[in-house]
From Swiss-Prot:
Protein name as it appears in the record: Small ribosomal subunit protein uS2c
InterPro entries with a match to the protein in the record: Ribosomal_uS2, Ribosomal_uS2_bac/mit/plastid, Ribosomal_uS2_CS, Ribosomal_uS2_flav_dom_sf
Family membership noted in the UniProt record: Belongs to the universal ribosomal protein uS2 family.
Cell compartment(s), UniProt: Plastid, Chloroplast
Entry's Gene Ontology cellular component terms: chloroplast; mitochondrial small ribosomal subunit
SUPFAM superfamilies found in the cross-reference section: Ribosomal protein S2
Highest taxon of the lineage: Eukaryota
Organism: Trieres chinensis (Marine centric diatom)
Length: 229
């Protein structure tokens, strides 16, 4: 796909960081200036690192690697599911449950439970149960779907993680690092670039910014899948 231009990044508001007092000094190399107490990110670096991330993802997809999209904040939730589905990947967009990756064996048992309940629902088993029991199972199914629907077909740990809002998803970031899973993440001015493998300096709050970057990353995965080795 064509590289994202500086004009596109600018229009999407990718350059807007947080208020200066909220910054992480480790982000200093990626900050262009400060304006009205708001840090402005260097879009030249954002474009270069987005290109690097895209190249990495395309290559990983060519090798048949798997991807997990992580983003639970309201601005990102729907986009995370949409883009992950568009490249046939996995996602967590409601709530990160501690141990989702590091306690994979336990998580697999919860996924098995989800699939059992879904089968019971499809077979209309709930209609044969006492009202109270049926209600409890429906509530359990709804909760499991919310938390696990995006990873219910994930049979092994993902090869690459794509994260929106490092601060919010720190538990997921720590689990990925513990397991050696490479992380690509949009990093706002309050983030820590040392905790990711490929940082993409950018606004992780604005929907337009999140959408532009996620779509670009997804396009690269799809390009790679077309030429799977």
């Amino acid at each position: 796909m064509a590289d994202i231009t500086l004009a596109q990044l600018l229009e999407a508001g990718v350059h807007f960081g947080h208020k200066a007092y909220r910054w992480n000094p480790k982000m200093f190399p990626y900050i262009y200036t400060e304006r009205n107490n708001i840090h402005i990110l260097d879009l030249v670096q954002s474009a270069q690192l987005l290109k690097e991330a895209n190249s990495y993802l395309q290559s990983a997809a060519e090798k048949g690697q798997t991807f997990l999209f992580i983003g639970t904040k309201p601005q990102a939730s729907a986009l995370i599911a949409q883009e992950a589905k568009r490249c046939n990947s996995y996602y967590v967009n409601h709530r990160w449950l501690g141990g989702m990756l590091t306690n994979w064996v336990t998580l697999k048992s919860r996924i098995a439970r989800l699939k059992t309940l879904e089968q019971e629902e499809a077979d209309q088993v709930f209609n044969l149960l006492p009202k109270k029991e049926a209600s409890l199972r429906r509530k359990e199914l709804e909760k499991l779907r919310k938390n696990l629907n995006g990873i219910k077909d994930m049979e092994k740990l993902p090869d690459v993680a794509i994260v929106i809002d490092q601060k919010r998803e720190m538990t997921a970031v720590i689990e990925c690092r513990k397991l050696g899973i490479p992380i690509i993440s949009i990093l706002d001015t309050n983030c820590d670039p040392d905790l990711v493998d490929i940082p993409i300096p950018g606004n992780d709050d604005a929907v337009g910014s999140i959408k532009l970057v996620l779509q670009s990353l997804t396009d690269s995965i799809n390009t790679g899948k077309l030429t799977t080795k």
